[in-house]
């Protein structure tokens, strides 16, 4: 899964007039319904959004009224080197928060390339697999109508079964700022109709319980970020048969990287010949909160057991 930085922008005047006011009471109620949106940014871009001491993200929350969370440094969406930003609030607050973030990222990128013509860019939304059917619609009718109305390119990735526990798909939007934001309006309105989606507001990594997100309080916090309470970190060492260490590592370290990313635990494997006392099992040391250790231990066992079962069949 390739990693792409995706930015877009618009002038303050465009941002103010782009989103139409609700026409009736039902639309007004929908606009106030709690919702959220998640999207990917590079690690460097995440730092720009946070700002010094959390000043930028605190300002964005105060202006938009939305809550903005990020996955931690080096905690990426599986298969990428991108972090997740989640914005939650009413539809209006979420859209306003997203516009502020994308406008800042694009203005910085635009200053670097010096291009006078606004390029077509990409933004990748993170959407639960269970909610993608509503975006696609029967026979693809809904997504086709969204493409026609917004003029943006919209592509939904297949569910990647390579990564254990991953239940999200990427919805890639390509186009100008106006095209992307119109597509986001349409998609977010459709997602908010799904009660399961609206209730699923936990953290940027709702499927990876081992991760802690970083939160920034919008007012009265002096711009300092607040972390979820962290559990005490411990180390547990387990034994894995020498011939099965390759299953834990994976090709090019893929498996151990996946386990580390999905659980938040740190994993260290002993050198060849360095065995658990009285065995030929290599030492696998797992460090982190108890819950992360348990998850990592389970995933390691599954990697080994799946290969053992194939061998005995």
Curated annotation (Swiss-Prot):
Stretches for region Disordered: 1-34
GO annotation (BP), single: RNA splicing
Taxonomy of the source species: Eukaryota, Viridiplantae, Streptophyta, Embryophyta, Tracheophyta
PANTHER family for the chain: KH DOMAIN CONTAINING RNA BINDING PROTEIN
Biased composition annotated in UniProt, kind: Basic and acidic residues: 14-34
Consequence of gene loss (knockout): Higher accumulation of ToMV in infected leaves.
Organism of this sequence: Arabidopsis thaliana (Mouse-ear cress)
UniProt protein name: Protein BTR1
Keywords: Acetylation, Cytoplasm, Phosphoprotein, Repeat, RNA-binding
GO CC list: cytosol; plasma membrane
């Amino acid at each position: 899964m390739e990693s792409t930085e995706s930015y877009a922008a618009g002038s303050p005047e465009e941002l103010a007039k782009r989103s139409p006011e609700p026409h009736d009471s039902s639309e007004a109620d929908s606009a106030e319904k709690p919702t959220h949106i998640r999207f990917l940014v590079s690690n460097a871009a995440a730092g720009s959004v946070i700002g010094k001491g959390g000043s930028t993200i605190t300002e964005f929350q105060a202006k938009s009224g939305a809550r903005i969370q990020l996955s931690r440094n080096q905690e990426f969406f599986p298969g990428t080197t991108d972090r997740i930003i989640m914005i939650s609030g009413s539809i209006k607050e979420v859209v306003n928060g997203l516009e502020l973030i994308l406008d800042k990222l694009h203005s910085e990128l635009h200053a670097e390339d010096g291009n006078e013509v606004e390029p077509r860019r990409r933004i990748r939304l993170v959407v639960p697999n269970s909610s993608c059917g509503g975006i696609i619609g029967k026979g693809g009718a809904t997504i086709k109508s969204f493409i026609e109305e917004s003029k943006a390119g919209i592509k939904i990735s297949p569910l990647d079964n390579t990564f254990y526990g991953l239940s999200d798909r990427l919805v890639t939007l390509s186009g100008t700022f106006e095209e992307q934001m119109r597509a986001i309006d349409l998609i977010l309105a459709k997602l908010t109709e799904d009660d399961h989606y609206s209730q699923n507001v936990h953290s940027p990594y709702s499927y990876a319980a081992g991760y802690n997100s970083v939160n920034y309080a919008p007012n009265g916090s002096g711009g300092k970020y607040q972390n979820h309470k962290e559990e005490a970190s411990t180390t547990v060492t387990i034994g894995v048969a020498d011939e099965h260490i390759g299953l834990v590592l994976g090709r090019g370290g893929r498996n151990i990287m996946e386990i580390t990313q999905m659980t938040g635990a740190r994993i260290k494997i002993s050198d060849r010949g360095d065995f658990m006392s009285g065995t030929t099992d290599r030492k696998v040391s797992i460090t982190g909160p108890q819950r992360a250790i348990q998850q990592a231990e389970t995933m390691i066992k599954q990697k080994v057991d799946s290969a053992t079962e194939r061998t005995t069949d």
